[in-house]
Amino acid sequence: RFLSSKTRPDDIAVIIGNADYKKQGKDIPNVTPAYADAGGIKEYVKQALGIAEENIIFLKDATQKDMISTFGTGTNHKGRLFRYLVPGKSRVFVYYAGHGAPGEGDSNYLVPTDAEASLIDLNGYPIKTLYKNLSKLPAKSVTGGLEACFSGASEAGSVINNASPVYLK
């Protein structure tokens, strides 16, 4: 239970819990705690931040299409999130639990549940696009949290077979 906050009718949250990568028949391991983590964050934003249920975009197992329609593309930032907010008034909270993956060069991606590991540069959602589009929102503030590893490895195995993961001992 969290301390209650007054209701903030203009504030918005996007919460994504990507856990079930196997249902798409892809070669990416599941992220077991992602649903529970996203559910806990949803309760937090409702109780502690005062965000109304109808102002929460809650996505379980978001596909590339879901992420694009929510956050926009590299050339159009006016996705679903943009349309929810009240310019200059809305505070935006974004949370993602799921896989992250390295791409070519210095690029990193959120991994949609329908992604193919060998094609992550084509079907991942670029972190640079996420940050760029969030920075273009006419919001009062934007707060984000990414619960994802970008090493290319997970407890259940390699996310990206050709990646060279970094391990801490």
Show the residue positions of the predicted features.
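Functional beta-strand-loop-alpha-helix junction segments that form "active/interaction loops"
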Residues: R1, Y35-A38, K42-S90
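Disordered regulatory segments flanking catalytic cores
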Residues: R1-K22, A139, V159
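Caspase-like (clan CD) cysteine peptidase catalytic core
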Residues: D10, I68-V159
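Hydrophobic/aromatic beta-strand patches that form the interior of the parallel beta-sheet core
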Residues: V14-I16, I57, T143-G145
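Cofactor-binding loop segments of dinucleotide-utilizing enzymes, especially the Rossmann-like FAD-
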Residues: I16-N18, D61, A97, E147
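Terminal peptide-recognition signature
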Residues: G17, I41, V94
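Glycine- and acidic-residue-enriched helix-capping/strand-helix junction motifs
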Residues: K22-G39, E43, I120
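Short, intrinsically disordered, charge-balanced linker/junction segments flanking boundaries
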Residues: A163-K169
